[in-house]
């Protein structure tokens, strides 16, 4: 698709966005940029969601100011990023991301294709719009005239409920295959359809996703795991076969289109995805942190374990149980651990949840729990795991804990919060080099 250099301007009368709908801190950043002679625009998903009368998760801003210039305007900020530097401005535990307008590089326009080629040059508003992944995310909103600036026909796609790539689909996928995941994500979350050209490009090029770093694929998938729209994502990912480029271990159970075994396992996956969505939506509605990534990922792997090991019918004890868990761990490592660059501790937690499921299901069905198992360190997590799996079978909703289980891959605490926490737990002492009262010449008394 080719786009004009002249944008479409959508005026106040033709769109629903009003200033009171925008986060007050984002408005503050926009005003400060303007007052200091810089252009500032609300951009991307924030504009998309406001246009659709949804509540944006984030309010991102683009500007013609360079990162260093933005830092000078906001003392409560930091610069992050490797491929492209952007500034995070902090407001009471919340952050507003401010990026400098970028251009498509000459390499991207005319040169040979390559995965994740460098793209860190600054550019104009139109160039920035055309380097974005999807047309529905390529919109700009400016507060002075309350107008939406559209270089990529994104408003038309929003009105038609269509997701499509900015530019020629195959070329855009080749440049960065992760764009396929984002297209499926937004189609699933918004309930949109993917344009025929973009859909065909994904179906024909899905295997290119394996060229991306495993950690990047993992982090992108975890966004979908907690999106509340995993079941919609799953359907699209399976139909395009992109799912198998992430979960190669599912290829055998689900690959035979007419096979007798395919329907049950696909139905199991779909039912589990709906349970995960319920958990994610409850966490978002309550403002609390959701269940851990390893916990939800293990839940999504139960149909695979059933297909390969007849998991829920296992009756093993003692040394035999240990051998089974080791086999499970080895297969998990080969099929997913390396592919998603999962830490060893994460893989071990997943094996504990999966290998204990048969035993916990038996106690769950009889509603009789031995005292010894309640004393195990893994009792709470395994019992909840069992209840959520049972929910996927029966539809009877499990009761979720008030405090979520430990979340892996969570963001690191700030230095300030870390030091406070350590002070409250750490025993006070004077080191041997102390110069305080109880020491003599810097030595302990």
Residue map of PLM features:
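Catalytic cores of the polymerase beta-like nucleotidyltransferase superfamily
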Residues: 1-445
């Amino acid at each position: 698709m080719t786009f004009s250099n002249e944008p479409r301007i959508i005026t106040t009368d033709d769109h629903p966005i009003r200033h009171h709908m925008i986060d007050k801190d984002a408005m503050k950043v926009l005003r400060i940029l303007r007052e200091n002679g810089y252009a500032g625009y609300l951009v991307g998903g924030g504009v998309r969601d406001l246009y659709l009368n949804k509540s944006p998760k984030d309010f991102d801003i683009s500007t013609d100011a360079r990162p260093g210039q933005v830092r000078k305007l906001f003392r409560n900020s930091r610069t992050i990023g490797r491929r492209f530097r952007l500034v995070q401005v902090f407001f009471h535990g919340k952050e507003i991301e401010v990026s400098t307008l970028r251009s498509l590089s000459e390499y991207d326009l005319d040169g040979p294709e390559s995965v994740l080629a460098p793209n860190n040059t600054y550019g104009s508003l139109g160039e920035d719009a055309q380097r974005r992944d999807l047309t529905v995310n390529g919109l700009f909103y400016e507060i002075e005239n309350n107008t939406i600036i559209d270089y990529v026909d994104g408003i038309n796609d929003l009105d038609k409920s269509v997701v499509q790539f900015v530019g020629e689909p195959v070329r855009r996928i080749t440049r960065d295959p992760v764009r396929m995941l984002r297209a499926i994500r937004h189609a699933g979350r918004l309930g949109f359809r993917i344009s025929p050209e973009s859909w065909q490009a994904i179906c024909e090029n899905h295997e290119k996703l394996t060229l991306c770093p495993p950690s990047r694929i993992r982090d992108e998938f975890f966004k979908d795991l907690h999106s509340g729209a995993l079941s919609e994502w799953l359907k699209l990912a399976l139909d395009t076969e992109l799912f198998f480029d992430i979960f190669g271990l599912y290829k055998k159970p689900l690959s035979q289109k007419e096979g007798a075994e395919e329907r049950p396992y696909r139905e199991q996956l779909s039912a589990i995805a709906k349970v995960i969505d319920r958990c994610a939506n409850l966490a978002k509605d309550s403002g609390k942190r959701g269940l851990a990534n390893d916990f939800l990922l293990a839940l999504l792997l139960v149909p695979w374990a059933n297909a390969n090991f007849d998991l829920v019918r296992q009756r093993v004890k003692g040394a035999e149980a240990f051998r089974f868990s080791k086999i499970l761990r080895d297969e998990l490592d080969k099929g997913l651990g390396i592919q998603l660059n999962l830490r060893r501790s994460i893989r071990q937690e997943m094996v504990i949840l999966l290998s204990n499921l048969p035993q916990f299901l038996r106690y769950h069905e009889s509603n009789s729990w031995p005292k010894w198992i309640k004393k195990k360190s893994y009792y709470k997590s395994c019992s909840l795991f069992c209840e959520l799996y049972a929910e996927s079978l029966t539809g009877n909703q499990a009761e979720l804990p008030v405090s979520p289980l430990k979340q892996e891959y969570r963001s690191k605490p700030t230095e300030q919060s870390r030091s406070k926490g350590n002070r409250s737990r750490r025993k006070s002492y004077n080191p041997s080099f102390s110069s305080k009262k109880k020491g003599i010449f810097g030595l302990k008394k």
